[in-house]
């Protein structure tokens, strides 16, 4: 089975589903908060025209997900799988934002756990690109066990390039840290990391 960039994923806390064009209004209702974007390279993404550009890029990516609360259906935010490299056995997770009321708790960990467990059924490494000055997201990556492997300029869809720190989490390290050892049911574990 090939890697699905837009899976439907569910936990007790969260429901992730492919982002649809008619999700714009509900997602912008979260994204219009300027404080969500204050450490992001594009701090104007709370503005509707700027967010429309982000949303268009998300739709064209083929990997964007809408995040909702499993119990209530409340819109929480969005994230994305992108840059799948089957030869290298890697995929990236990013473009994530969450409503502020979900910051500082277990939501980001629950989200990344769902996405990492899906990814590690197919690839050996997950990459994250984080804005160099986004200390909140960089702290979250440290807590998640991400290892810095470099820096690179990233030009988000229709935006100017900015320096991003590249983090990696390898399947073996994740499984050791979380106590998991098997690929999701019915999936090949894929190539093992040699790094």
Region annotations inferred by a language model:
Residues 66, 74-83, 92:
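Conserved beta-strand in the GNAT
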Residues 1-53, 164, 172-195:
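A short, well-structured alpha-helix characteristic of acyl/acetyltransferase catalytic modules
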Residues 104-118, 139, 143:
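Conserved acetyl-CoA-binding loop-helix of GNAT-fold acetyltransferases
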Residues 68, 94-106, 131:
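A short, internal acetyl-CoA/4′-phosphopantetheine-binding micro-motif in the GNAT/acyltransferase core
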Residues 134-150:
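Conserved active-site alpha-helix within GNAT-family acetyltransferase domains
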Residues 121-130:
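Conserved GNAT acetyl-CoA-binding A-motif
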Residues 84-93, 103, 107, 124:
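A conserved beta-turn-beta hairpin within the catalytic core of GNAT-like acetyltransferases
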Residues 129, 147-163:
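Conserved catalytic-core motifs of GNAT/GCN5-like acyltransferases
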């Amino acid at each position: 089975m090939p890697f699905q960039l837009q899976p439907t994923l569910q936990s007790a806390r969260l429901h992730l589903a492919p982002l649809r064009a008619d999700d714009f209004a509900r997602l912008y209702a979260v994204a219009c908060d300027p404080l969500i974007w204050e450490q992001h390279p594009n701090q104007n993404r709370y503005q509707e025209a700027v967010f429309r550009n982000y949303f268009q890029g998300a739709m064209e990516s083929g990997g964007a997900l809408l995040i909702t609360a499993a119990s209530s259906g409340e819109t929480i935010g969005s994230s994305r799988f992108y840059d799948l490299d089957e030869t290298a056995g890697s995929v990236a997770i990013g473009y994530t934002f969450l409503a502020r009321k979900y910051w500082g708790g277990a939501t980001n960990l629950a989200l990344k756990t769902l996405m990492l467990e899906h990814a590690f059924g197919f690839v050996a490494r997950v990459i994250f690109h984080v804005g160099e000055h986004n200390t909140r997201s960089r702290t979250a990556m440290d807590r998640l066990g991400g290892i810095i492997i470099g820096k690179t300029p990233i030009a988000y869809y229709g935006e100017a390039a900015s320096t991003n720190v590249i983090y990696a989490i390898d399947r073996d390290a994740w499984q050791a840290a979380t106590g998991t050892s098997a690929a999701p049911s019915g999936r090949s574990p894929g190539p093992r990391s040699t790094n």
